[in-house]
Amino acid sequence: MTDVSAAASRPAVPPSVIDPDAPAKVAARNLNFYYGQHQALKNINLSIAANRVTAFIGPSGCGKSTLLRVFNRMYDLYPGQRVEGQVLLDNTDILDPRLDLNLLRARVGMVFQKPTPFPMTIYENIAFGIRLYEKLSKSEMDDRVEKALQGGALWNEVKDKLNASGLSLSGGQQQRLCIARTVALRPEVILFDEPCSALDPISTAKIEGLIDELKEHYTIAIVTHNMQQAARVSDTTAFMYLGEMVEFGPTNKVFTSPADRRTQDYITGRFG
């Protein structure tokens, strides 16, 4: 299926999800971000509705992964970076320096490009994060681990080997373990940064199917270089170029009748 036909087959998304004044789960307002003197994000404004999948597309270096990292303040881990504007999570500005970052990152989970299982058992990969926030009995923890692995579409494959190392799993299974680890903390938003770029087509299809299931319970933002993937999994799509938000709207509209020539040129492969 082509990018355009995949996008066209998706149900239309109400225009309200891109109304900057509409209620949003996550919203950026006049957002600017700097790596030292380099401005990586330029006056970003967008609203992401709850229980939708929003894809961020654009050429390498356009700022899409940077934007994702601003959503849970990963940039705080590195010196010399600066942010201006607002990022709202349920109308609370997460850029407030008084905010508890551990609690923020529990609410806004992240799955990275390369699977990053901990060097411990499958069970402990899930339980470790839960223990940082909650004190559960053994039976309660067992239940949470099972539910998390079910949420990551992995339970049936690992239920008989929970004491095996997470590193013993295949690449696709490791990525689903990372998703389960994120789900275990009961976040409200899940950020995916190129989650399938290191996976084979079969594993990619499983992750995409899982994302479609997860949006029933979570708000999802995904960065991808794969146009077909963006068209398949997302409800709304944002095209970014040179740190700017060029276009943001329902995926079927962005792919079939983009409003900006740069969007059309990128989607049709004229650059990028």
Curated annotation (Swiss-Prot):
Localization per record: Cell inner membrane
GO molecular-function terms, A-Z: ATP binding; ATP hydrolysis activity; ATPase-coupled phosphate ion transmembrane transporter activity
Keyword ATP-binding: yes
GO biological process, one term: phosphate ion transmembrane transport
Superkingdom per UniProt: Bacteria
E.C. designation(s): 7.3.2.1
Membrane topology: Peripheral membrane protein
Binding annotation for ATP: 58-65
Gene Ontology CC annotation, any one: plasma membrane
Domain ABC transporter: 26-267
Pfam families named among the record's database cross-references: ABC_tran (PF00005)
Keyword check for Nucleotide-binding: yes
UniProtKB keywords: ATP-binding, Cell inner membrane, Cell membrane, Membrane, Nucleotide-binding, Phosphate transport, Translocase, Transport
SUPFAM superfamilies: P-loop containing nucleoside triphosphate hydrolases
Catalytic activity field: phosphate(out) + ATP + H2O = ADP + 2 phosphate(in) + H(+)
Signal peptide coordinates: none
Family: Belongs to the ABC transporter superfamily. Phosphate importer (TC 3.A.1.7) family.
Function according to Swiss-Prot or TrEMBL: Part of the ABC transporter complex PstSACB involved in phosphate import. Responsible for energy coupling to the transport system.
Subunit structure: The complex is composed of two ATP-binding proteins (PstB), two transmembrane proteins (PstC and PstA) and a solute-binding protein (PstS).
Protein name: Phosphate import ATP-binding protein PstB
The organism of origin for this protein: Nitrobacter hamburgensis (strain DSM 10229 / NCIMB 13809 / X14)
